[in-house]
């Protein structure tokens, strides 16, 4: 039984703290008619309000995504990439500023792992709708390099995360003995104020350091973890999700990986594997948001941060093209780039390790533009699946 929650912000969505778990299982048979005939699609959706622990992913439930995944079906399938979380969950009941409940955190992404220290990668970024923030991107565009790890948190914690990263650089000699340096940490955000006491400012330096310390390769957690802990997506619980694709260009095998912090969209637009399930589920576990009478919030407002990693040798202008394909994956599952949404994306390549050189001319490799279609397709597919994984 699901009991109604009398909290002033959210009803019917109880605490996301364990051990309270809501499993919504809906088996829907949809008949889709087009010029080629009638297709019957059997779809199983399981949305689990969990913070940690073993849980199924979208493919485990039989959702038929397109494309071949890497070993972990994660951004960490791209060699060298490490991801870490700090997850902050505390309290229940009514939202009281400064007291909670707390549902927030920090996500850290290291393109070449934290042991590499200062090791810039070619990168570029793109914003579908800019009602949000990703710091450091003006220098990414200007220089063509991502020089720092990528951090993701909630809207009100961008500053503390940025400052903590800079302090960590000093404490760990990130620049390996250089006496004079400057940099612009890349910190992105989405708004978790519906499930989190966001104006209590609960993210602290210690949480940033924890996310950094926890960064590792291999299998990574999804859902209510890291910066995604308090996020909502397409009418249900959102959070952190990841996926990857492995493909060939001529005789070489490459990988594209995606990680998302998903906090966007209206339930009516939810689509899974091409099936418009949001229409069928429009009356399933609807929450009530008791906004002030003059609130300008519209259904579908929210944000999504997407980071794409690849080992394909790409130059910054080509990575811009990759970042511009990310919205196609977001749109497949129901994103519309609403006015109140911060849809901000960044793509980087781990190839060309010696490309950054302050003093000497360097020689780099780049894939021909005519060969990029598999990279585009892999990007769209990985983003689509990562978003659904964030909701499972």
Description of each model-found segment:
Residues 54-392:
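Alpha/propeptide regions of enzymes that mature by internal proteolysis
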Residues 1-54:
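Bacterial Sec-dependent N-terminal signal peptides
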């Amino acid at each position: 039984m699901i009991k109604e929650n009398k909290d002033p912000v959210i009803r019917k969505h109880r605490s996301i703290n364990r051990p309270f778990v809501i499993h919504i299982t809906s088996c829907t048979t949809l008949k889709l008619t087009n010029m080629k005939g009638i297709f019957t699609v059997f779809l199983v959706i399981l949305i689990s309000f969990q913070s940690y622990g073993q849980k199924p992913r979208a493919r485990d439930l039989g959702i038929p995504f397109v494309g071949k995944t890497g070993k972990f079906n994660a951004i960490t399938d791209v060699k060298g990439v490490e991801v870490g979380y700090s997850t902050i969950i505390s309290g229940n009941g009514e939202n009281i500023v400064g007291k909670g409940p707390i549902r927030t955190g920090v996500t850290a992404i290291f393109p070449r792992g934290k042991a590499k220290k200062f090791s810039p990668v070619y990168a570029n970024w793109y914003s579908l709708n800019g009602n949000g923030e990703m710091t450091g991107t003006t220098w990414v565009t200007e220089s063509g390099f991502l020089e720092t790890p990528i951090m993701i948190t909630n809207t009100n914690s961008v500053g503390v995360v940025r400052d903590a990263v800079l302090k960590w650089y000093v404490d760990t000699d990130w620049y390996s003995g250089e006496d004079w340096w400057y940099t612009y940490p890349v910190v992105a955000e989405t708004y978790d104020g519906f499930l989190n006491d966001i104006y209590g400012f609960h993210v602290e330096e210690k949480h940033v350091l924890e996310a950094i310390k926890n960064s590792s390769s291999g299998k990574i957690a999804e859902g209510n973890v890291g910066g995604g802990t308090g996020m909502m997506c397409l009418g249900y619980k959102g959070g952190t999700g990841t996926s990857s694709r492995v493909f060939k260009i001529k005789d070489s095998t490459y990988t594209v990986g995606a990680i998302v912090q998903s906090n966007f969209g209206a339930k009516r637009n939810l689509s899974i594997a091409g099936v418009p399930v949001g229409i069928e589920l429009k009356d399933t576990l609807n929450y009530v948001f008791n906004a002030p009478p003059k609130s300008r919030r519209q259904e579908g407002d929210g944000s999504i941060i997407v980071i794409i990693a690849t080992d394909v040798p790409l130059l910054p202008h080509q990575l811009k093209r990759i970042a511009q394909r990310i919205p196609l994956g977001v749109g497949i599952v129901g994103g519309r780039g609403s006015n109140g949404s911060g849809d901000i994306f960044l793509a980087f390549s781990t190839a060309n390790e010696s490309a950054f050189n302050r003093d000497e001319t360097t020689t780099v490799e780049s894939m021909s533009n005519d060969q990029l279609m598999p990279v585009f397709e892999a990007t769209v597919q990985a983003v689509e699946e990562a978003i659904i994984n964030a909701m499972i």
